[in-house]
Amino acid sequence: MSEFEPIRGMKDYYGEELNKIKFIEETFRTVVLNSGYQEVYTPIVEDFKLFSLKSGEEIRKTMYVFKDKADREVALRPEITPSIVRVYLNSMQHLPKPLRLFYVGQVYRYDEPQFGRYREFRQAGVELLGSSSSFADIEVISLLNEIYDSLGLKDKIIIKINNIGIYREIFNKAGITEEQQEHLLHLIDKGKVDDALKEFTDNNYKDLITYLISLKFDKLESDKLESLRREVSKYNFNLEGEINKLSFISEVLEDLGVKIKIDLGFVRGLAYYTGVIFEVIHPDVSFSIAGGGRYDNLVRLYGGADTPAIGFAIGVERTALVINKIKSDLQRKKIAVIPLISTKDSLSLAIRLLNILRKNNIIGVLNLKDVPLSKLMTYYVEEGYNAIVLIGKKELEENSITIKFLEKREQKTVKLEKIEDVLINNLS
């Protein structure tokens, strides 16, 4: 074992674990590209102030922050949304709205490492900028559901949803500053409700927030929404608009077959959310595996014009934890080509065959192991290969190859001109 190990909270990925991560990211890319989103790359190292302005209390405490050789305070990005907003402000404001962007990349947070929580991890996310419509909210949340459907997880996941605009309205009426609001939401997010309620001197506010936090239902129930409206009306709050948004979005999502859970006590740790918020939960893990929300003030905070926006980020490694097995029909086929004699002609034919395989999106590997054929068969079965191709003296003389299909336990001798058709038909 090497004396050098990955830094605590970070890890190496290879084999099946890496295959799951790549499967998630490739599936994500396919779905979002088909939905009209364009990819953006941003640096891992950014100006510290980009994140310290509005990323939220918890994230600011867990950032990797340091000074570079020019004495600038910089940070490893703890999330990617602020970077996307920076790109938009610098280079994309002139483009037609709404603007649909996506990203895939590593982020860093100095959390205490535990199952499902790493200090370096990957996020795949989208941002839709320039629309305040509830249609945009529905597009983004249903897109998230579609991604998990494509990953084979739709039947297991539930999307938890709330409208943080309800809390913002109450806090604004109570005269609570934005900075105080961020702290209160952080306390509620961490389950420290009693500490949050201590910030209020008016018992009416305490009673209403206590009621909201307790309200949750697994599907859209009109009687519970009516109960919410009646309760809110007692306190003379104008929350009808925010409640109606939550009701409309939930109703359409249910019509689309999205499994949702409305939870009025659910808030997210990012300080910039202003409207609908959501996260993906899975019964096999105790933490969310994806989440997002509406952030209509962030562009203005960074110096731009008012630009409504909504987005989400998928925790790639967290999602990988709940994928038991990559769909077999989405895994690429693998074939090993084994020259049985060491001649120029056998090697030339092997390389030509490998090129045919790769052209057809089949993984082709030249055998370099000098062991008996029986051991090779066992090895390639254990490694998950679908077939092996034998090229010996007889095959060269007859201008053919021998294919052993390992799953079907079938063997075929095929003329060279028929190789492509036989492989495609038997491996599809």
Swiss-Prot record:
Annotated catalysed reactions: tRNA(His) + L-histidine + ATP = L-histidyl-tRNA(His) + AMP + diphosphate + H(+)
This protein's UniProt keywords: Aminoacyl-tRNA synthetase, ATP-binding, Cytoplasm, Ligase, Nucleotide-binding, Protein biosynthesis
CDD domains: HisRS-like_core
GO cellular component: a single term: cytoplasm
Main location: cytoplasm
Similarity remark: Belongs to the class-II aminoacyl-tRNA synthetase family.
Official protein name in the record: Histidine--tRNA ligase
